[in-house]
Regions:
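Pseudouridine synthase
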Residues: 34-38, 109-111, 140-192, 212
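A late-sequence structural motif
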Residues: 152, 198-201
Length: 217
């Protein structure tokens, strides 16, 4: 693994680039966005670096980006068809009664407020959302959970846990708490088939050694 001045790069070849997106950095290609920062990190201002999936701006962790149009098309297909694996770690306030479970909800989107909400019944714009989780550790008013997404709705993890009374630490959009930390949600593992060779590739990364993550390290 190589650590650059701007962005930590975990793997790179002619087709793909796997890196760790810092919190507060946009996933999209615009000034200050992840592809732009990667070009600076690599010292290649004209490099073809394409976003094929996204993390919320406030979320950090592993992402894979494409290095050419063909790779972007193939990786995007995997994301659409569910062949792309994404696993997250989060720190919740409290501990769910079930240490391992699947959460299923109907989620809608309030575009004016830029917020996601749990809907009571099917309606226009409402989509099914599903995730599985496992409690890895508990400490006082916090629990470390591992999350596997089955759908990729906006703010899905944050809303599904907050609606059950277990908001993430650092959550300011779906909780009234004022935690002294960043949002405790991290893309800890990704897996995909290499767009050229077809080889399955899997990457893991530890969350930052800052509060509240350091309570479990």
């Amino acid at each position: 693994m190589q650590v650059m001045n701007l962005i930590e790069i975990c793997y790179e070849d002619a087709d793909v680039l796997v890196c760790v997106k810092p919190p507060r950095v946009l996933s999209t290609d615009e000034p200050g966005g992840l592809p732009s920062l990667l070009r600076q990190t690599l010292g290649e201002p004209e490099a073809d670096i394409r976003t094929v999936h996204r993390l919320d701006r406030v979320v950090g962790g592993l992402m894979v980006l494409a290095r050419n149009p063909r790779a972007a098309s193939e990786l995007s297909r995997q994301v659409r068809e569910g062949a792309f694996e994404k696993q997250y770690w989060a720190v919740l306030h409290g501990t769910p009664e079930q240490k391992e479970d699947t959460l299923c909800d109907l989620l809608g989107r309030d575009k004016a407020r830029k917020m996601t909400f749990v809907a009571d019944a099917p309606a226009k714009g409402v989509q099914e959302a599903s995730l599985s989780y496992q409690v890895l550790a508990q400490k006082e008013d916090a629990s470390l959970v591992q999350i596997q997404l089955h759908t990729g709705r906006t703010h899905q993890i944050r809303v599904q846990f907050a609606s059950r009374g277990y908001p993430l630490w650092g959550e300011r959009k779906y909780s009234t708490r004022d935690d002294p930390c960043e949002l405790a949600l991290f893309s800890q593992k990704i897996g995909f088939f290499h767009p050229k060779t077809g080889e399955w590739m899997e990457f893991r990364h530890e969350p930052p050694s800052a509060f509240p993550w350091d309570c479990f390290q």
